[in-house]
């Protein structure tokens, strides 16, 4: 991904005048959906193998929609543990000639740059991670940030929106595939456990739940 895709950096200054509706919706936080595929369950010792992030936009009526997805395959950090069972579960083949993996720092730098652009466009001050069992994804993200020494992390360090919880409330389902099906979405189990696919499905699920709540009168913009 070329830096030409991003025309300017967010300097932390919010625009003057009326705030964008997205900034009002979540107290200045921009939802960004993240999924990681890993070499195990321990964020301190196990490899980060894939990461995807989908930014969320808002239309003129205040409804959310998945906007742009960033996706990278990651080279395991030096000394990383990789459990064979994890590779079997995800189907990731580390030696595949077309894997085209990059270092953690490059992936995070480019994802964060795109998120900062989205923050500025939406008048938001910080990103908040959305994930299915979000503490897992946030834990691996924070561990990778610490390993690489990246200073400009746009995400809140511990707050998140968990779609497993939201889907349990909305549909009585906590498994991603079953929650998507309950929401009337298509879900291909053959594509599951790819960070890109799971992120985009989680983003669709999150937007659907939030939009359904709005339709029921659960959140009204100041202009509604």
From Swiss-Prot:
Keywords, comma-separated and alphabetical: Exonuclease, Hydrolase, Magnesium, Metal-binding, Nuclease, tRNA processing
Binding positions (Mg(2+) 2): 35, 37, 193, 198
Catalytic residues of the enzyme: 193
InterPro entries, sorted: Exonuclease_RNaseT/DNA_pol3, RNase_T, RNaseH-like_sf, RNaseH_sf
Top-level taxon in the UniProt lineage: Bacteria
Residues marked Important for substrate binding and specificity (site): 41, 89, 136, 158
Domain Exonuclease: 32-206
Free-text remark on how the cofactor is bound: Binds two Mg(2+) per subunit. The active form of the enzyme binds two Mg(2+) ions in its active site. The first Mg(2+) forms only one salt bridge with the protein.
Any Pfam family the entry gives: RNase_T
SUPFAM superfamilies: Ribonuclease H-like
Role: Trims short 3' overhangs of a variety of RNA species, leaving a one or two nucleotide 3' overhang. Responsible for the end-turnover of tRNA: specifically removes the terminal AMP residue from uncharged tRNA (tRNA-C-C-A). Also appears to be involved in tRNA biosynthesis.
Classification via PANTHER family: DNA POLYMERASE III SUBUNIT EPSILON, RIBONUCLEASE T
UniProt protein name: Ribonuclease T
Source organism of the structure: Pseudomonas paraeruginosa (strain DSM 24068 / PA7) (Pseudomonas aeruginosa (strain PA7))
Organism ancestry: Bacteria, Pseudomonadati, Pseudomonadota, Gammaproteobacteria, Pseudomonadales
The gene coding this protein: rnt
